[in-house]
Amino acid sequence: MTEKIILASGSPFRKAMLINAGLDVEAVPADVDERALEAPLQDSGVSPEDVALVLAEAKATEVSERRPGALVLGCDQTLSLGDEVFHKPADMEGARRHLLALSGRTHQLNSAAVLVRDGKVLWRHVGIAGMTMRMLDPGFIGRHLALVGAKALASVGAYQIEGEGIQLFEKIEGDYFTIVGLPLLPLLAELRTLGAIDG
């Protein structure tokens, strides 16, 4: 028996990951102003990992209020380079700036998942991956962005490792699912513990 999971997100990629794992999923996008929640957290020195957890919890809690009794999953991912937190680039120039800043350096992807039922947090987890980009020539960055187009605007790092973006990297440390935005293995383990999925 599988309980329906309400995904507090409009992300087709996260929904597809959950469906591919055999879960019964309904997407209900959260109505949360992420930047308004995030700004005071960053100003007070909250870690990028904890920012991701707070945002994931806010999304799950907001949707949980609209879906009484449902098991709601909230997710968020932050990218940090030292103390700097990156957001999805707004345009191709922003994507170019992201890749120039990340070139030759190691950044961290922090993927948070939170399960909530009736406003009560049942579980929270953040997976962390270290991503080392190779040194990128500005000309190569321009050609790469021309190749991938608007896909560069769909992720916080302006790349998708499941596609052409893998060519940007020298070394990756961490779980694939964490890198693409959802710590799936720990989530599945918790869903089994809760009896929400068979296992």
Curated annotation (Swiss-Prot):
Q: Which residues form the active site?
A: D76 (proton acceptor)
Instruction: Give the reaction(s) catalysed.
Output: N(7)-methyl-GTP + H2O = N(7)-methyl-GMP + diphosphate + H(+)
GO molecular function list:
nucleoside triphosphate diphosphatase activity
Subcellular location field: Cytoplasm
Q: What is its EC number?
A: 3.6.1.-
Sorted alphabetically, the Gene Ontology BP terms of this entry are:
nucleotide metabolic process
Q: Report the family membership.
A: Belongs to the Maf family. YceF subfamily.
Protein name as it appears in the record: 7-methyl-GTP pyrophosphatase
Q: Which organism is it from?
A: Mesorhizobium japonicum (strain LMG 29417 / CECT 9101 / MAFF 303099) (Mesorhizobium loti (strain MAFF 303099))
What broad taxonomic lineage does this protein's source fall under? Answer: Bacteria, Pseudomonadati, Pseudomonadota, Alphaproteobacteria, Hyphomicrobiales
